[in-house]
Design a protein with these regions (language model features):
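A short beta-strand structural signal in non-transmembrane regions
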Residues: 34-41, 123-124, 150-152, 175-180
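Alpha-helical transmembrane segments
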Residues: 4-33
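Conserved short loop/turn motifs at secondary-structure junctions
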Residues: 4, 34-45, 70-72
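Short beta-strand boundary microenvironments
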Residues: 25-26, 49-63, 67-134, 146-148
Length: 180
């Protein structure tokens, strides 16, 4: 009766109080954007009077960037796997504008450079990976492409593999279609 309902309310508030700080940390300290738009075709971004022109001319838009995102699978040397989203930007400086790359313990900054391959902490832990380890990304053609991990970043809500433009082009075999 009343005791059961009261218990459910307390549990609900407890869950809310334990989740909200994580959401706040992710959205205020680690990810810095107000909106993400998924594109079905890069032409929506680049055509005349397309999204890029609209964003450039809007006084409400402080900054924007073209990104590539795609779900894929990572594999470690032992055959363990994890599903992740690859994230790369048309301009590498956008990566550090929209994402903070740092360690969870100590908040040491992780540089984002031309050869960066940064994995979220929980995924690296689940695959038993450390900085300098080689792992494999399943490419669009089904082949597994080796990458060397350059950083393990604090993260709470997503499983992501952040790649520099050079690493992304190497993985894809050319310039990606910017879809986000």
């Amino acid at each position: 009766g009343v005791a059961g309902c009261t218990a459910l309310l307390l549990i609900g508030f407890g869950i809310q109080d334990s989740i909200l700080p994580i959401v706040d940390k992710q959205s205020e300290q680690l990810t810095h954007n107000d909106m993400t738009i998924a594109l079905s075709d890069e032409k929506a971004l680049t055509m005349e009077q397309g999204l890029a022109d609209t964003l450039d001319s809007s006084s409400a838009v402080h900054s924007w960037g073209a990104f590539y995102t795609k779900s894929t699978t990572l594999y470690n040397e032992e055959g363990g796997s994890a599903d992740v989203s690859i994230v790369g930007a048309e301009d590498d400086t956008r990566m550090t504008e929209y994402f903070t790359f740092r360690t969870r313990v100590g908040h040491d900054p992780i540089p984002f450079e031309e050869d960066s391959v940064i994995l979220t902490e929980k995924t690296a832990l689940n695959l038993g990976l450390s900085v300098g380890d080689t792992f494999y990304v399943e490419a669009a053609d089904g082949n597994r492409v080796p990458l060397t991990l350059t950083g393990i970043a604090e993260n709470y809500m997503f499983t992501r593999l952040y790649l520099s433009g050079a690493q992304l082009e190497s993985l894809l075999g050319g310039t990606p279609e910017w879809n986000t």
